[in-house]
């Protein structure tokens, strides 16, 4: 049975980031919309996520956010990450709903951009939804998936995912939307608002989630051929809540 495209008219906008400007601080030391690190201070990949400074790693131009990865003179790569929640748990998060980013991905081997969500309560496990993960060595596909990280609490991790083939190069040459609709029973992924894949929503995902976007490098793949600089372009990040059924018609 073919799934319907996403009907955005059945949703109301709850979080709108159009990147006409960028309200970011390193750690939420002031009340900013975004912080420039994971709230738990966990780096990953082969580039260090750096504090925001004038012109790097974040710039905005005509409603487009540029996240730049750059190789410094000492050989260190630096790049950018944004999270809507700070280490105190303050900021935007939402239980259930549709989370979407419109982006143009950087070309080149070694780039590893992502748009992803983390569950707000990490006390018993970490709930993660990867709306988009892209590996520059394979410009003809991207992945989506989920994780429930329990090992740090002595449990077993749960993971699942899907690889989506696309026309070679279109993710680098055009903007596309990457979205996930989390509902109590089903979590569904969309590419350009066309249904791609779904899984049964686990009880661990019955909590607020918050969005993150970043340009990482590596993920086990060499970065000696990675273009310097590499730039992820983000048009917007929007979050929606499903309207009551009678209001959606």
Where do the protein language model's features map onto the residues?
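GH16 jelly-roll
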Residues: 1-249
């Amino acid at each position: 049975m073919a799934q319907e495209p996403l009907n955005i008219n059945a949703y109301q906008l709850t979080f709108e980031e159009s990147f006409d400007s960028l309200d970011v601080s390193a750690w939420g030391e002031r009340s900013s919309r975004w912080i420039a690190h994971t709230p738990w201070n966990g780096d990953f990949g082969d580039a260090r996520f750096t504090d925001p400074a004038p012109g790097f790693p974040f710039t905005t131009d005509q409603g487009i956010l540029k996240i730049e990865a750059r190789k410094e003179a000492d050989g260190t790569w630096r790049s950018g990450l944004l999270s809507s929640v700070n280490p105190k748990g303050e900021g935007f998060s939402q239980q259930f709903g549709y989370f979407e980013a419109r982006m143009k991905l950087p070309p080149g081997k070694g780039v590893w951009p992502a748009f992803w969500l983390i569950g707000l309560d990490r006390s018993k496990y970490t709930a993660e939804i990867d709306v988009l993960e892209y590996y520059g060595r394979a410009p003809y596909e991207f992945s989506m998936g989920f994780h429930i990280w329990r090992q740090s609490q002595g449990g077993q991790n749960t993971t699942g995912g899907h690889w989506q083939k696309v026309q070679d190069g279109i993710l680098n040459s055009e903007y596309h939307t990457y979205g996930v609709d989390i509902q109590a029973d089903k979590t569904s992924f969309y590419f350009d608002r066309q249904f791609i894949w779904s899984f049964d929503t686990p009880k661990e995902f019955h909590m607020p989630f918050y969005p993150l976007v970043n340009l990482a490098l590596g993920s086990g793949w060499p970065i000696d051929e990675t273009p310097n600089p590499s730039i992820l372009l983000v048009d917007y990040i929007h979050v929606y809540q499903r309207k009551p059924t009678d209001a959606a018609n």
